[in-house]
């Protein structure tokens, strides 16, 4: 009963770690966890896994649910990530953004966001006393108010990760979602806007412990 609900081709890592370059991002829906477990324990699946393993240099498998868990953000005490990235893409100087500017400015894109929230927000930006999940929600509300309509952005898929099944165990995420932008130009104009960098981004940085931002485009099959 699995269903491929999203498939994108990787174009660039805007916020990420060296060596984390991806060729494909697939969103696969299973009816239940039991269905997934039954599949991976099946002898035929185990037999064909050699083709998968022989083809991949690196991968992640992240279990997610659609509804927000009661214990959101995750209370798992796995320690802080070995290497963490809050989200400053240095829009006017970073090599990643220079490569971003070299690609077709008018092409529609998706941005995959992986977010791990802080236990408590940083003070000084109007989010004092909140947990990181509530702070990030305030950031999301501000983005919807200030940019969604003007930029033409939307969030077609949003999930709540439960666990990293394949990947470093210190990569623990609280949110995973895709944001659709009408063009690379629209995204860059937003993140370089002075109001975003001196307002909205401060809310994000105060709430986020670790993050990834991966530029993707719809895959043609």
Q: What residue ranges belong to the model's regions?
A:
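Flexible, disordered linker segments and immediate boundary regions flanking tandem C2H2 zinc-finger modules
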Residues: 49-53, 200-203
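Short S/T/G/P-rich N-terminal loop/turn motif that feeds into the first structured element of a domain
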Residues: 1-25, 31-46, 55-178, 182-198, ...
